[in-house]
UniProtKB/Swiss-Prot annotation:
InterPro entries: NHR-like_dom_sf (IPR035500), Nuc_recep-AF1 (IPR021780), Nucl_hrmn_rcpt_lig-bd (IPR000536), Nuclear_hormone_rcpt_NR2 (IPR050274), Nuclear_hrmn_rcpt (IPR001723), Retinoid-X_rcpt/HNF4 (IPR000003), Znf_hrmn_rcpt (IPR001628), Znf_NHR/GATA (IPR013088). Belongs to the nuclear hormone receptor family. NR2 subfamily. SMART domains: HOLI, ZnF_C4. Residues 220-448 form the NR LBD domain. Residues 12-29 have a biased composition (Low complexity). Composed of three domains: a modulating N-terminal domain, a DNA-binding domain and a C-terminal ligand-binding domain. Residues 1-127 are annotated as: Modulating. GO terms for biological process: cell differentiation; nervous system development; positive regulation of transcription by RNA polymerase II; retinoic acid receptor signaling pathway. The gene is rxrgb. Residues 194-217 are annotated as: Hinge. GO terms for cellular component: RNA polymerase II transcription regulator complex. This is Retinoic acid receptor RXR-gamma-B.
Length: 452
């Protein structure tokens, strides 16, 4: 496949028909290089919107301008920040009296029972009692947003259990509500959400099974899993034959090999995102923001699933097999072990298929908490559609595994935590300058980012 064809811009319709926009994004073909290799690197923002070494930027193909100060890389850690506070799930039981025990620090939040609507038109003025986002109404006894409503419902219906990796006092707000499921669930209970309301809703749903089937069908039509599978297959690298890498026979160290593979996969990531239903319908700036926010997790998920076919190592998109021993000798053994244990091994044990992988990656892509989005509610609605389609798919494809959907979602916190730790390593390698980092990966690392 021709390199330039792979990097076609995300929006298929002409973006420069308006005379007010500069005609710089109409085509990847013949895009001029504006920076020579002999000149010093430009500022991060100008780097992202330009090409380097005669090759176009992977993100210049999806937006006419990246110089807007409103665009930033969400949730990117810098050196010295602790990234191990990502939510993790385990077998800790949360049934019984513990369900209604509010976590420490929630008492001063006030009683939401006094927060009443004065008129039907004032409903939109309510805020979510859990995270402070815009409320969509009263759900399970509490004014809440669609995100917290869906989170609470999934927790109860799937009987999910969580644990807090901190001191059970995590801040739950619009920006950080997904960081700790344990504290988010406890806050739902503390604010008055009722478990029995979810169970009653399920019973009513059984009495209206025909309506539920129709709704599920509509969700599947809105977010068809076959389209998501097509997206995965369209960018799948040909790795029928691969080269083994070890300290004795590899000219490059594993970190260099991984960075080189990530650089190549950034282009296919753009092509993959274009094929995910409704992604191309989002504003171009939002598309850029979502890809910047999730590129590391999206790439890690891909090579982790690809690696279930090899033994004690990871299989890169370039066809190179990196052994565990090579990673340890390069000083990245700890994070390498986590990838193998928390991702590759789990995917292999449950025999995760390509459709399920694609849905998990789509969930990561549609991140409503990415900073700078023009409409986070729209992105959250798309994520909910992926949830619904994935749940329906697992029930139909694996009817003998009722807990499979929950097991799939359990991989997301681990993926998040590992993705943040990998970014820490990349920033370190970039800082010390010992590892060659290719053009497009460097652009992502130099993009403006914020710490959450």
């Amino acid at each position: 496949m021709d390199t330039h064809d792979t990097y076609l811009h995300l929006h298929s319709s002409p973006l420069n028909s308006s005379p007010s926009q500069p005609p710089v994004m109409s085509s990847m073909v013949g895009h001029p290089s504006v920076i020579s290799s002999s000149r010093p690197l430009p500022s991060p923002m100008s780097t992202l919107g330009s090409s380097m070494n005669g090759l176009p930027s992977p993100y210049s193909v999806i937006t006419p301008s990246l110089s807007s100060p409103s665009i930033s890389l969400p949730s990117t850690p810098s050196m010295g920040f602790n990234t191990l506070n990502s939510p993790q799930m385990n077998s800790l039981s949360m049934n019984g009296n513990e369900d209604i025990k509010p976590p420490p620090g929630l008492a001063p939040l006030g009683n939401m029972s006094s927060y009443q609507c004065t008129s039907p038109g004032s409903l939109s003025k309510h805020i979510c009692a859990i995270c402070g986002d815009r409320s969509s109404g009263k759900h399970y006894g509490v004014y809440s947003c669609e995100g917290c409503k869906g989170f609470f419902k999934r927790t109860i219906r799937k009987d999910l259990t969580y644990t807090c990796r901190d001191i059970k006092e995590c801040l739950i707000d619009k920006r950080q509500r997904n960081r700790c499921q344990y504290c988010r669930y406890q806050k739902c209970l503390a604010m008055g959400m009722k478990r029995e309301a979810v169970q009653e809703e399920r019973q009513r749903g059984k009495e209206k099974s025909d309506t539920e089937v129709e709704t599920t069908s509509r969700f599947n039509e809105d977010m068809p899993v076959d389209k998501i599978l097509d997206a995965e297959l369209s960018v799948e690298p040909k790795t029928e034959t691969y080269t083994e890498s070890s300290p004795s026979n590899s000219t490059n160290d594993p970190v260099t090999n991984i960075c080189h593979a990530a650089d190549k996969q950034l282009f296919t990531l753009v092509e993959w995102a274009k094929r995910i239903p409704h992604f191309s319908d989002l504003p171009l700036d939002d598309q850029v923001i979502l890809l910047r926010a999730g590129w590391n997790e999206l790439l890690i998920a891909s090579f982790s699933h690809r690696s279930i076919t090899v033994k004690d190592g990871i299989l890169l998109g370039t066809g190179l097999h990196v052994h565990r021993s090579s990673a340890h000798s390069a000083g990245v053994g700890s994070i390498f072990n986590r990838v193998l244990t928390e991702l590759v091994s789990k995917m292999k044990d449950m025999q995760m298929d390509k459709t399920e992988l694609g849905c998990l990656r789509a969930i990561v892509l549609f991140n409503p908490d990415a900073k700078g989005l023009s409409n986070s509610l729209e992105v959250e609605a798309l994520r909910e559609k992926v949830y619904a389609s994935l749940e329906t798919y697992t029930k139909q494809k694996y009817p003998d595994q009722p807990g499979r959907f929950a097991k799939l979602l359990l991989r997301l916190p681990a993926l998040r935590s590992i993705g943040l730790k990998c970014l820490e390593h990349l920033f370190f390698f970039k800082l010390i300058g010992d590892t060659p980092i290719d053009t497009f990966l460097m652009e992502m690392l130099e993009a403006p980012h914020q710490i959450t």
